[in-house]
Amino acid sequence: MANEYFKFKRFTVHQDKCAMKVGTDGTLLGAWAQAPQEPSRILDIGTGTGLIALMMAQRYPNASIVGIDIDPAAVAQARDNVTASPFADRISIYEADICHFYENDTFDSVICNPPFFTGDLICPDKQRAVARHTISLSYHDLISSAYKHLSANGRFSVIIPIESQSNFESEALMGGFYLSRLCRVKTTLVKKPKRCLIELRKLPVSESVNTCEVIEINPGIRSDWYKELTYDFYIR
């Protein structure tokens, strides 16, 4: 059973009401995604516990962050986590579907740790199924929504399973995006990449950055890359 809360250096994430708990994927994305300027407006789609919104607020002290989720329980929990954090005055959490979400202005950074199962058996737990499966948000809908809400010079960042990379990149290209950064992530040196961090932009880039990194060099021994990436967040 997952812990009811996860303590970071500057904030604590309670997660007992959320289907999806704090995990490596969300932490990776929250530490890797970029906002192109300060002050920035940042949109966290499917905020869940509010983890990524909190991480971006810590990394960008002058940014204002909006987190949205369709799950009322997750929204309530994210609001509680934000209220208890040092960043409460810069983060707003709303119950909303990104496909019908309306904002007067665009965002400099749009971030999403999207539902990632496309062909697996659907979990009988409705809350968990919505959080985990693309029945709630297809890549096509996510990409078109992100494009609509992203500023001209903004960045759209996601983390997806490596087996979905080709499909996601094709949808992104058809949706008007250009690939600017790509990082394939291995859990250990001997394993194949499991996840893929992707950054997209509306404007063409001269050359995209393509890397492959590893989380652990040996069991329980984090790589220098992962330690540096998450240094400001993990207590140990």
What do the predicted segments below correspond to?
Residues 10, 39, 62, 88-90, ...:
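A generic structural signal for alpha->beta connector loops
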Residues 14, 66, 92-94, 180-183:
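General small-molecule cofactor/ligand-binding pocket signal
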Residues 18, 22, 136-193:
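Conserved Class I SAM-dependent methyltransferase catalytic core
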Residues 29, 113, 142, 200:
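Residue-level signal for inorganic ion chemistry
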Residues 31-104, 109-112, 118-123:
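Conserved SAM/SAH cofactor-binding pocket of Class I
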Residues 114-141:
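Mobile active-site "lid"/loop adjacent to the S-adenosyl-L-methionine
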